[in-house]
Amino acid sequence: MNTGTRAAEKLRRIPASEVEFHAGYLGDPNGRLFTWKGELYRGIAHHRAAFYRGLFERGIVRRLIETGHLVTTDLTDLQLDGYALILKHRRIRFVSYPFCWSGAMLKDAALLTLDLDLELARYGLMMQDAHPFNVLFDGCRPRFIDFTAIVPAGERPVGWVDEQFHRTFTSPLHMMARGHGRLARSLLRERELPILPDELTLVDAAGTRWLHSVAQRGTSLLKSVARRIIPPGPRAKLRGLVSPPLTLEARIAYLQHLRAQTDHIRVPFEHSVVPSDTERSLDVVEPTASWNQRQLSVHRVLTEKRPGTVLSARSERAWFSVCAAKLGAKVVALDPREETVAHLHALSKREHLDLLALVMDIRDPSPGMGLCNQALAPATRRFRCDMVLALDLIPELIFKHDLNSDQVVEALAQFTKRWLLLEFFPWEDPEVRRFHPEENPFFPSGFYDWYSLDGFTRVLARHFTTIESLPSDAKGRVLLLCER
């Protein structure tokens, strides 16, 4: 080996000390996700290298990327000790989890998973697991991200994969369809098997719940009797006769049927778009005579500062999130109301926006979870943006949820890298009076004397070096543009 060859190999080799492995992928024998120099890679285990290289050579990976099923993935010539192959993934800017999705988003992810499984089946492949944590939303579009979940057909019991799909997709969707979205999202925090059959029956009508209970107990009893009277060998043969291996045609037919069933589930607000926002979404790039002063000021800030990423801390008025997205920013829009999130998600899909809408309250962002709270990163790390928009928010946080100015500013400041655009509401504003009438028996006179523009500005000055006042449309309201 000459000197030039050795130098080239050294350049391609990744120093182990510079690698940061992803904490949530410890149990995958096929490979491991890691970051290096800000980019996302996946090391492939030696026993899988030939198989995954073959997927590239056969054009399967390219096909899955072109159809929008799989996140962009490239084969590299990089080397890392302990791995036979290194892949590079396009990094999706905002990492979101199923417990923050609307019902329509979970359904989009379920249909993507089934479409991918159908495509894989035609190539003699399958997924070794089928749960929503394998999907990320790239703006408003779902993408499958777990490359090493793709394995040869028949390597994993199909029944186990299907059962996982039902518990992590079908059952939550049915729960949401019955109006229990908040409960479904809470249970989706369990990554593996979040919703068990008996948990789903809790939201059924009483008569249906009784039938489910009887059927479940009967099935358990039959299985128990079979285990006692039939030896293991004959029992395995009997299982093979009752549930013979699926042919390719039968597997495809089953997946197509499951897809039709999933598509038929009607989750709340699935196809809704707020009419006023639909009309306005087309004129957010260039000012028009119909714009109010607040829209003009926000548009001016977005066009002058050109933030690459924007977080909207409250998104009931979709105009501002849409404006940021159409001006070129990657946007994540938070709101505690699923209806608002579903409306914005539907609008984003229709307008092809790089905008991710999530069910989340800025007062209670999702924490880190899993081993050492590292398997799932906290929202404050995942959604930190160049700019935070805090419009139509302050009166509710202070006068409804009893936060003070320090708490409000700190909650917002932790999400921004550089700018915060906050709207201040004066005492006489109707929005303030809506939450805190002049005569409030619960609070003594003078309880909110600290609430003033000067007081808020002093708190903001502890976190930001410059604060600029901009006009809003209502009398006395002020937009405060804060910069670190």
Mark where each language-model region is:
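Conserved SAM-binding loop of SAM-dependent methyltransferases across substrates and taxa
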Residues: 317-329
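Catalytic activation segment of kinase domains across protein kinase-like and atypical kinase folds
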Residues: 126, 131-179
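Conserved SAM-binding motif I beta-strand of class I
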Residues: 330-335
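Conserved beta-strand signature within the Rossmann-like core of class I S-adenosyl-L-methionine
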Residues: 411-427
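A conserved beta-strand element that flanks and buttresses the S-adenosyl-L-methionine
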Residues: 389
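Conserved class I S-adenosyl-L-methionine
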Residues: 306-316
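S-adenosyl-L-methionine
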Residues: 343-382
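A short, conserved alpha-helix within the catalytic core of class I
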Residues: 396-411
